[in-house]
Amino acid sequence: MLSRFMSNTWCTPLRQAQRLFSSTTTMQATLNQIKRGSGPPRRKKISTAPQLDQCPQRKGVVLRVMVLKPKKPNSAQRKACRVRLTNGNVVSAYIPGEGHDAQEHSIVYVRGGRCQDLPGVKYHVIRGAGDLSGVVNRISSRSKYGAKKPSKS
């Protein structure tokens, strides 16, 4: 009985080594099986803006307006704000463009998209929506900053 037990424990690593060096491959799905939808399930895409609850934008109320400093190689005064969204979450959002009229209790819309050199800021405020006006005298990339088309006269 003892010798049988010892032979089983000694053979297990040998069998594992044989399996590693085996020339036969594992079975793969045929084209018909793939067409039918079998195989490993697709991994779900992880949201980069989880606080928005799968929505493209969320309305929110500004709690406070902040001026933040960026990470090491950059130097600036970046404008951001804390926003309480309609789903109850509180997020930090970057205010793009030059100059803004956001203040406490302003109604703003928040979209996903992080500000790369501000740690913890993973959302952008949408200019030209809600109480936040668009950037004045903006000529290029106006749609990103909520600016109207300048008049020709």
Curated annotation (Swiss-Prot):
Q: How does it assemble?
A: Component of the mitochondrial small ribosomal subunit (mt-SSU). Mature yeast 74S mitochondrial ribosomes consist of a small (37S) and a large (54S) subunit. The 37S small subunit contains a 15S ribosomal RNA (15S mt-rRNA) and 34 different proteins. The 54S large subunit contains a 21S rRNA (21S mt-rRNA) and 46 different proteins. uS12m forms part of the decoding center of the mt-SSU.
Q: Which GO terms describe its cellular component?
A: mitochondrial inner membrane; mitochondrial small ribosomal subunit; mitochondrion; ribosome
Task: State the function annotated in the UniProt record.
Answer: Component of the mitochondrial ribosome (mitoribosome), a dedicated translation machinery responsible for the synthesis of mitochondrial genome-encoded proteins, including at least some of the essential transmembrane subunits of the mitochondrial respiratory chain. The mitoribosomes are attached to the mitochondrial inner membrane and translation products are cotranslationally integrated into the membrane. uS12m is required for respiratory growth.
Record organism: Saccharomyces cerevisiae (strain ATCC 204508 / S288c) (Baker's yeast)
Which Pfam families does the protein's record reference?
A: Ribosom_S12_S23
From the Swiss-Prot or TrEMBL record, give the protein name. Answer: Small ribosomal subunit protein uS12m
Q: Which residues form the signal peptide?
A: none
* Source taxon at top rank: Eukaryota
- Family in the record: Belongs to the universal ribosomal protein uS12 family.
One molecular function GO term is:
structural constituent of ribosome
- Record's miscellaneous remark: Present with 238 molecules/cell in log phase SD medium.
The UniProt entry, under CDD domains, shows: Ribosomal_S12
Keywords (A to Z) from UniProt: Mitochondrion, Ribonucleoprotein, Ribosomal protein, Transit peptide
